């Protein structure tokens, strides 16, 4: 069973190891339960590393009912959260894979969501837009482990 504290993960920099997409989603759901709103979470990792799987778990943990897919072609998708347990109303999912520069992200209006207390912003391929991220952003890096399903997940503050 995965039991995680965001604070302990950040303080001790101990990576979490998941052995399946289901475990990665479970980790994300645990993190979702600790979110208050206003957070920006940057996701870093190679293609197929588990970033979108993580967002799916985060969304489920926040009570999103819709199917969550990577917004590679639309760049940004806003999911409405109607779960009364949360003050968070919007999960903003951004995929920067196709961006050639940070300005392209500004052009879609993402800055209006940064720091909003009723929103959480999650950005795949965040390394491409690091210069735009708020200073207190959480950065989560995904690396492949010993087999094709294992992931080593490190959470840090930016």
Task: List each model region and its residues.
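Conserved lysine of the Walker
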Residues: 51
């Amino acid at each position: 069973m995965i039991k995680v504290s965001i604070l302990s993960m950040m303080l001790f920099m101990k990576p979490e190891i998941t052995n399946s997409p289901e475990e990665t989603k479970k980790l994300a759901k645990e993190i979702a339960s600790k979110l208050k709103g206003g957070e920006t979470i940057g996701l870093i990792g190679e293609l197929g590393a588990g970033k979108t799987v993580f967002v799916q778990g985060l969304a489920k943990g926040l009570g999103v009912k819709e199917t969550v897919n990577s917004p590679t072609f639309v760049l940004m998708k806003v999911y409405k959260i109607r779960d009364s347990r949360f003050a968070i109303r919007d999960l903003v999912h951004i995929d920067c894979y196709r961006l050639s520069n940070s300005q392209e992200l500004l052009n879609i209006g993402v800055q209006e969501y940064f720091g909003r207390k009723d929103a959480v912003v999650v950005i795949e391929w965040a390394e491409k837009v690091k210069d735009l991220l708020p200073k207190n952003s959480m950065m989560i890096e995904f690396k492949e482990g010993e087999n094709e399903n294992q992931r080593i997940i490190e959470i840090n503050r930016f």
